């Protein structure tokens, strides 16, 4: 079992502005295991970026305890490392942002090399290291280009190479893909996944997009107004979200909301007959292998008309969603719904015929 490389325990962050007090983060506990790609999702102002900045003490918490790679760096309102020790610890944590923060007058190679300016490596070793990093992020042929000559995705690759220059154990991505188009976003996410596997890198993804969490993360925390409201594996959160905000986020990543809008406009749904029910089914794991709908007809003479279906793979587990119209005698439909509920499915009756 992987050990926690980041432990944030009971973190409070409070800002005082004139006569106003802002509780940006309230009592948040998050443990991130080594090798995780861990998503922290929330809308603007949720406190996610503020929380993550305490990992390397770019933001000092008001209360709480911070442990990074077994070292307690903050506890009981005090830093536990000397300035020199903290500087060394920060080298273990790379960061990338929405804005690439590249130096316009330096080439891609020079931008990456800048991160090694305090390194003990020789000039030749630094040169070799930069070449290796640019190759790692797929920019060997762009090494001598200036930022103005690079696309957004290429600039972010330079930023990633720079963030990896000091061989960090942790990479924090703070909305790093939000300025990129969908295709480039997928490419950057694929690169981060590759780096996670090749380097054993722990990646912390700050985002407001649940699609990114679904595509790359293995665990996720959901924040709202400074509080952590839900946390777990991506599979568990997508299969069985508890909080309304989490459910709203998941809808943006599955397409179910758009499907429901279109389905409810269909005549067959508008004029649903008395012997029918419009039902939404969510299922995961082994349930996807079972002929559930066929069994309903065999057992209850209830037919199923599939209006929408989608299956995705999360953490090597199939997760699916369907919207169906069940038709049959009212008592038989009730029995069928009860059967579905006891088959490890999440069943929501959207409409009954009248």
From Swiss-Prot:
Binding residues for ATP: 42-49
Broadest EC class assigned to this enzyme: translocase
Listed SMART domains: AAA, NIL
Catalytic activity as recorded in UniProt: L-methionine(out) + ATP + H2O = L-methionine(in) + ADP + phosphate + H(+); D-methionine(out) + ATP + H2O = D-methionine(in) + ADP + phosphate + H(+)
Organism of this sequence: Streptococcus mutans serotype c (strain ATCC 700610 / UA159)
Family annotation (InterPro entries): AAA+_ATPase, ABC_transporter-like_ATP-bd, ABC_transporter-like_CS, ACT-like_dom_sf, MetN_ABC, MetN_ABC_transporter-like, NIL_domain, P-loop_NTPase
Keyword Nucleotide-binding: yes
Membrane topology value: Peripheral membrane protein
Gene designation: metN
Subcellular location: Cell membrane
Enzyme Commission number: 7.4.2.11
Main location class: membrane
Ranges for domain ABC transporter: 8-250
GO MF assignments: ABC-type D-methionine transporter activity; ATP binding; ATP hydrolysis activity
Designated name of the protein: Methionine import ATP-binding protein MetN
Family to which the UniProt record says this protein belongs: Belongs to the ABC transporter superfamily. Methionine importer (TC 3.A.1.24) family.
GO CC annotation, single: plasma membrane
Keyword ATP-binding found: yes
Recorded superkingdom: Bacteria
CDD domains associated with the record: ABC_MetN_methionine_transporter
PANTHER family attached to this UniProt entry: AMINO ACID IMPORT ATP-BINDING PROTEIN, METHIONINE IMPORT ATP-BINDING PROTEIN METN
Protein's job: Part of the ABC transporter complex MetNIQ involved in methionine import. Responsible for energy coupling to the transport system.
Subunit text: The complex is composed of two ATP-binding proteins (MetN), two transmembrane proteins (MetI) and a solute-binding protein (MetQ).
Keywords from the named record: Amino-acid transport, ATP-binding, Cell membrane, Membrane, Nucleotide-binding, Translocase, Transport
């Amino acid at each position: 079992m992987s050990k926690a490389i980041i432990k944030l325990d009971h973190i409070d962050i409070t800002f005082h502005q004139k006569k106003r007090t802002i509780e940006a983060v309230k009592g948040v506990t998050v443990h991130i295991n080594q090798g995780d790609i861990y998503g922290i999702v929330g809308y603007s102002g949720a406190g996610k970026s503020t929380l993550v900045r305490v990992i390397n003490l770019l933001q000092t918490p008001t209360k709480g305890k911070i442990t990074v790679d077994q070292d307690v760096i903050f506890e009981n309102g005090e830093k536990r490392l000397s300035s020199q020790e903290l500087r060394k610890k920060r080298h273990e944590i790379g960061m990338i942002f929405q804005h690439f923060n590249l130096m316009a007058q330096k080439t891609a190679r020079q931008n990456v090399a800048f991160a090694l300016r305090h390194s003990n490596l020789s000039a030749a070793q630094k040169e070799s290291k930069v070449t290796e990093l640019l190759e790692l992020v797929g920019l060997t042929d762009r090494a001598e280009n200036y930022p103005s000559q690079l696309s957004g995705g290429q600039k972010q690759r330079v930023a990633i190479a720079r963030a990896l220059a000091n061989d960090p154990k942790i990479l924090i991505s703070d909305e790093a893909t939000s300025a990129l188009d969908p295709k480039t976003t997928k490419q950057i996410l694929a690169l981060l996944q590759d780096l996670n596997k090749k380097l054993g890198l722990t990646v912390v993804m700050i985002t407001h997009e649940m699609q990114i969490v679904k595509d790359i993360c293995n665990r996720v925390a959901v924040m709202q107004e400074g509080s952590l409201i839900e946390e777990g594996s991506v599979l568990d959160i997508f299969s069985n979200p508890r909080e309304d905000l989490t459910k709203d986020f998941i809808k943006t990543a599955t397409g179910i909301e758009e499907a429901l809008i279109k389905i409810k406009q269909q005549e067959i749904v508008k004029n649903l007959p008395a012997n029918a029910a419009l039902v939404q089914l969510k299922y995961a794991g082994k349930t996807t292998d079972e002929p559930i709908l066929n069994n309903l007809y065999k057992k209850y003479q209830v037919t199923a008309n599939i209006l929408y279906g989608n299956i995705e793979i999360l953490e090597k587990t199939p997760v699916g969603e369907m919207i169906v119209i069940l038709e049959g005698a009212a008592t038989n439909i009730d029995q069928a719904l009860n059967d579905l509920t006891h088959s490890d499915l999440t069943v929501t009756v959207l409409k009954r015929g009248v």
